[in-house]
C-alpha cells in the first residue's frame, strides 16, 4: 500500500479538519497517510527541505519562499473556499487588523505609536500583509523620499508565538493591535464566543488562502493519474468529508496555480528591498 507523509504548518485549531481531509484522500486513493503537526517554521524544516514531505498544508508566503530554493518545488493540489459572504465564493482569506473593542483605534493611521504583536515574521497574514500595508501607508506620508532612518510606526512590536496568543494579548491589554488570519479568528470566536466582546476589526487585507500542496516528485513517483484522484477526492468530496467541511465552514475545494500566489511574494520582496521591518 502506498504511504504518504503529510504535515500541517497551519494553526492547530483546525488540525482535526486536516485529519479529515487526508483521510478522505486515503479512502479515495486506497493509501495510508500519516499527518503530523509541524513544530518549526517550514523554511527551517529539514523534512521539507529534503523533500521527505508528500503533502503539506502551508501558508502562501513560505510556499513561495520554499519554491524559490527547492529542488523539488511544491505544487498546489487544491484550495478551500470558505463559507460566508465576505469570501465571495473565492479562494481567499484576510489579514484582519484587530484592536480592543474599547480602544480609540478606528482606522489604520490611528495605530501610529501603538503596541503591535504578531504570530511570527514568516507569517503572511500576521506579518507580511500588514508590513506591505504599512509600507504603502508610509510611502504616502513620505512621497518620493526614503523613510527616515530608524523610523518606527509602532511604539512596540512583539512576537506572540501564535494568532491565538495575539488575540489573547489584545483582549487582556498586553498589546493594542495585531493582524490575524480570518479563518483562525473565526474558529477561535466559535470556540470562545466571549472573546468577541473584547475585539474589533478595523481593516481587512485580502490574500490568497493557504493551499494544500504536494511535492512535484509525486507525479513521477506515483503517476499523474494518482495525483488526479487525490485532487478529485477534494473537488468531489465524499459524505464524510462533506460533513467535516460543513463543521469547518469550508464551502468547497477548487483548483489553483502557484502563479496565483505571486502577489504574496511580490509584497514580501518589496518589504525586503525597502529594508523594512515592523519594529
Predicted features and spans:
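Bilobed "Venus flytrap"/periplasmic-binding protein-like clamshell domains
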Residues: 2-28, 38, 89-166, 241-251, ...
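A short beta-strand-loop structural module common to alpha/beta enzyme folds
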Residues: 31-41
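Segments of small-molecule ligand-sensing domains
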Residues: 33, 225-279
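Short loop/turn segments at beta->alpha junctions
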Residues: 39-40, 59, 162, 181
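Short, hydrophobic alpha-helical packing/hinge segments within bilobed ligand-binding/sensory domains
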Residues: 43-47, 53, 63, 163-169, ...
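Acidic, polar ligand-binding/catalytic clefts
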Residues: 47-110
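A ligand-binding cleft/hinge motif common to bilobed small-molecule-binding domains
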Residues: 57-71, 135-136, 169-172, 176-196
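Periplasmic-binding protein-like
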Residues: 78-94, 193-231, 246-259
Amino acid at each position: 500500500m502506498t504511504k504518504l507523509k503529510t504535515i500541517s504548518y497551519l494553526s492547530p485549531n483546525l488540525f482535526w479538519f486536516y485529519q479529515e481531509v487526508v483521510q478522505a484522500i486515503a479512502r479515495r486513493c486506497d493509501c495510508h497517510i500519516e499527518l503530523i503537526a509541524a513544530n518549526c517554521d517550514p523554511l527551517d524544516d529539514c523534512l521539507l527541505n529534503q523533500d521527505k514531505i508528500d503533502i503539506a498544508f502551508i501558508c502562501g508566503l513560505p510556499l513561495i519562499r520554499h519554491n524559490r530554493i527547492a529542488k523539488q518545488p511544491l505544487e498546489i493540489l487544491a484550495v478551500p473556499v470558505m463559507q460566508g459572504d465576505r469570501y465571495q465564493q473565492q479562494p481567499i482569506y484576510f489579514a484582519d487588523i484587530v484592536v480592543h473593542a474599547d480602544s480609540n483605534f478606528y482606522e489604520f493611521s490611528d495605530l501610529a505609536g501603538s503596541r503591535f504583536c504578531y504570530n511570527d515574521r514568516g507569517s503572511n497574514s500576521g506579518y507580511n500583509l500588514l508590513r506591505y500595508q504599512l509600507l504603502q501607508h508610509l510611502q504616502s506620508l513620505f512621497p518620493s523620499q526614503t523613510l527616515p532612518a530608524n523610523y518606527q510606526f509602532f511604539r512596540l512590536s512583539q512576537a506572540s508565538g501564535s494568532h491565538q496568543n495575539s488575540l489573547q494579548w489584545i483582549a487582556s491589554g498586553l498589546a493594542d493591535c495585531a493582524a490575524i488570519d480570518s479563518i483562525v479568528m473565526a474558529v477561535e470566536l466559535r470556540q470562545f464566543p466571549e472573546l468577541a466582546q473584547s475585539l474589533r476589526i478595523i481593516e481587512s487585507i485580502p490574500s490568497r488562502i493557504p493551499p494544500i500542496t504536494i511535492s512535484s516528485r509525486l507525479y513521477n513517483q506515483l503517476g499523474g493519474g494518482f495525483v488526479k484522484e487525490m485532487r478529485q477526492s477534494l473537488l468531489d468530496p465524499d459524505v464524510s468529508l462533506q460533513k467535516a467541511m460543513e463543521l469547518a465552514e469550508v464551502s468547497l475545494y477548487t483548483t489553483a496555480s502557484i502563479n496565483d500566489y505571486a502577489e504574496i511574494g511580490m509584497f514580501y520582496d518589496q518589504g525586503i528591498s525597502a529594508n523594512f521591518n515592523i519594529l
